[in-house]
């Protein structure tokens, strides 16, 4: 069978990890067709040096008609490019899942995918267990909560914390609210909360707690979804990416796992 082609949108620390991982581990099934960033003139030489093809424009990506486009850039990238990609017959892999907390955007992407025979794939990112979360929620009367514990530097720049200082000598809860409220206040920090919510109880029912913990070396995510008969707890601790303390290297590898699953005759759910 011919290889499937994958375009990558975004080439920060995680985009670089993803492109290299696809080349190293899935080269029999996939080929990276090219890479596009909003700052392509700045990034073009680095992309070439790494052995990949830079797209000179977003239109060049569309004209190339890859099988999949992987967004590994930002919520804004999902807003800007998602619908256009789907209408062009290109399936979309989303890592900045926080974008899907916007009901109108999520519905637009769903309708575009359905009308054009494409799909939107939501990656598990820095967590996982979406199959369990879906199952528990489908059984009915489900409740959900996700606790996030991160070092203060991982939370820097969040709109919710503008004008606020975080203590450097003790752990402190800095946010309590719904997943929808969390992604508005922490757009680069809680994609996992939105993904877990969409897979289970919804963004308005999923409760989110964010703690700042000085000296913490990893990002801790503890997801609890329960109903009257089942209580599921998923806990993942992962070290942040050295190049971007707000993100986990696991996010890039979750895309690799998704694509491997899509290429396999046996799928794990």
List where the protein language model places each region.
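NAD(P)-binding Rossmann-fold cofactor-contacting core
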Residues: 25-47
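Extreme N-terminal starter segment of soluble prokaryotic enzymes
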Residues: 2-6
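General beta-strand structural signal in soluble alpha/beta enzymes
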Residues: 71, 94, 120-124
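Beta-loop-alpha module in the N-terminal Rossmann-like domain of NAD(P)-dependent dehydrogenases
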Residues: 56-87, 99-103
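Active-site-lining helix/loop region of Rossmann-like oxidoreductase modules
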Residues: 9, 17, 121, 126-269
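Hydrophobic/small residue at the entry helix of a nucleotide-binding pocket
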Residues: 14
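A short helix->loop->beta-strand "cap" motif at the edges of active sites that frequently abuts
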Residues: 52, 88-90, 115-118
């Amino acid at each position: 069978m011919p290889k499937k082609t994958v375009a990558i949108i975004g080439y920060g620390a995680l985009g670089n990890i993803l492109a290299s991982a696809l080349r190293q581990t899935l080269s029999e099934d996939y080929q990276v067709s090219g890479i596009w960033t909003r700052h392509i003139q700045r990034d073009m030489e680095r992309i070439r040096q790494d052995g990949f093809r830079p797209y000179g424009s977003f239109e060049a990506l569309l004209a190339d008609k890859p099988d999949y486009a992987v967004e590994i850039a930002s919520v804004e990238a999902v807003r800007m490019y998602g619908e256009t990609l789907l209408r062009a017959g290109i399936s979309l892999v989303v890592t900045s899942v926080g974008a899907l907390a916007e009901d109108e955007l999520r519905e637009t992407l769903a309708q575009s995918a359905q009308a054009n025979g494409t799909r939107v794939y939501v990656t598990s990112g820095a967590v996982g267990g979406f199959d369990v979360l879906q199952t528990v929620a489908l059984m009915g009367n489900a409740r959900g909560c996700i606790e996030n514990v991160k070092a203060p530097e991982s939370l820097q720049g969040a709109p919710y914390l503008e004008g606020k200082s975080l203590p450097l000598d003790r752990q402190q809860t800095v946010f309590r609210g719904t997943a929808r409220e969390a992604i508005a206040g922490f757009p680069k920090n809680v994609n996992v909360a939105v993904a877990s919510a969409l897979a289970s109880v919804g963004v308005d029912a999923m409760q989110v707690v964010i703690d700042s913990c000085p000296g913490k070396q990893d990002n801790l995510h503890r997801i609890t979804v329960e109903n009257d008969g089942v209580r599921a707890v998923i806990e993942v601790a992962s070290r942040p990416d050295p190049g971007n303390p707000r993100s986990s290297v696991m996010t890039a590898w979750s895309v690799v796992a998704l694509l491997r699953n899509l290429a396999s005759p046996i799928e794990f759910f």
